């Protein structure tokens, strides 16, 4: 990305993030570690995996986020530049004025509540549209990777709607 005349090249190597060849942070399941000072920053998430609060290792609240149902930022207090992982824990890409979330399989536009690529399993649900996010029910559903959505109850339990051969489905079926 460009800021003024300066160009920054970001590389993602697993959980490590490099900018211009220098390690800047390492992502973990609970937050991230900044390489410049080796400090841990914790994500406090809601039942859908939305990063609601970011807390520094010393207990200082660095960021508080509130979301519209389809993932648009309703408000973000303190510094909006603390970290880019927001709705469903996905990276919010603000390049060129676009607020798109990167789900891996495809990009998502929260202002439209739509994907920017066809649903890979869209032939199974043609009545819902090929670009609809979470069957137009973002309050009770999540889509962890842009490929399939799941129901989430108020306790944060994910209910599998379709059985596949994926390991997470096999584990779910086994009761683990």
Name these PLM-found stretches.
Residues 24-25, 159:
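Short, isolated positions in well-ordered beta-strands
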Residues 5, 21, 38, 155-156, ...:
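Intrinsic-disorder/low-complexity loop/linker signature
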Residues 1-2, 19, 54, 115-117:
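Short hydrophobic/aromatic-rich beta-strand segments that constitute the beta-sheet cores
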Residues 8, 14, 19-20, 24, ...:
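A motif-centric feature for acidic-aromatic and gly/ser/thr-rich catalytic loops and repeats
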Residues 1-11:
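N-terminal presequences and immediately downstream first alpha-helices
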Residues 58-73, 96, 104-106, 110-176:
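Short turn/helix-capping motifs enriched in Asx and small/polar residues
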Residues 2-3, 17, 151-152:
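Short aromatic-centered micro-motifs
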Residues 28:
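Conserved, surface-exposed functional patches that form binding/active-site neighborhoods
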